[in-house]
Amino acid sequence: MSSLAIRYHQYGKLQECLVAEEVSLPEIEPDQVHIKLLAASINPSDFGMIMGSYGQKKELPAVAGREGVGEIIEIGKNVNHLKPGQWVQFPESLGTWQEACVIDAEGLKVLPEGLPIEMAATLFINPPTAWRLLHDFVELKSGDWIIQNAANSAVGIFVIQLAKKLGIKTLNIVRRKELKEKLKELGADEVFSEEEEYWKTGPEITGGKGIKLALNSVGGESAINLIKGLSPGGTHVTFGAMSFEPIRFPTRQLIFGDIKLAGFWIDSWMRSHSQKEVDTQFENIYALIKEGTFSTIVEKWYSLSAFKEALEHAAQPRFGKILFRGEE
């Protein structure tokens, strides 16, 4: 058996490092399963992994991709808790940008029936990140305000969707003005572009309530402006650095505004919490999908063989996810 896989043999720029290769799959052992890829996502963290700047480096050569959904097509003779046809989380440890894999059956996450394929493919990073950002740092209640940059990112959209359900008001920052109406259609309360001095009008926008929580995934000047928009005693959480620019935090706000700084990485949260807590997290997400609160916006699907075009598209300004579809 063989499988098409998008691999890298060294760390560096995506277009220079990634190659499509046919890799041999091992014969299935009694305690293993054979999984075919249904769909996989392209995330900013994938770029960082390939460049060697994100998380823990993999042993090379490595298959790219951190997130995806697969279907079990064969089980080993000792496997009795799984069956062909079930959807499972495609193993991140093996890389998700490949047509198929063979892996131990123990520990595979089985997905509930009825999930839209685009939601199943984007389930494991951004939805739990959005949930934790709104639940773990500040006690928020209906009517409270938060502010976030990169509001059109996958996490940003999930934050808007979840905040709307919880009654939390969102002040959203984007780079392109044409995205304002699209985000408002999703439930965003206020949307500003980066060049607008939104931090000066915060009290007016919020009716004097102020802003308790800032969510930063950009860095640089954008992150600093979020701090300026926070109310005294507010919390600023950084969970990404898409601009690759350092943050020079304004001393005045830190000292006299009593601003609190925090960082967040969903991988660390998953590792530091019990399996029961992780399972509960995903049960909450499944419920939000079922009721229609969470949905993934897709801009375009690509085959794995068209990975170069897919990555070029993913690196451009857009509204929605770029996804890989597995072969039929």
Residue ranges: model-predicted function:
Residues 3, 286, 291-297, 308-328:
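C-terminal capping/lid region of NAD(P)-dependent oxidoreductase domains
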Residues 89, 147, 212-215, 237:
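N-terminal Rossmann-like NAD(P) cofactor-binding module of classical short-chain dehydrogenase/reductase
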Residues 123-196:
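Mid-domain Rossmann-like dinucleotide-binding core that forms the NAD(H)/NADP(H) cofactor-binding site
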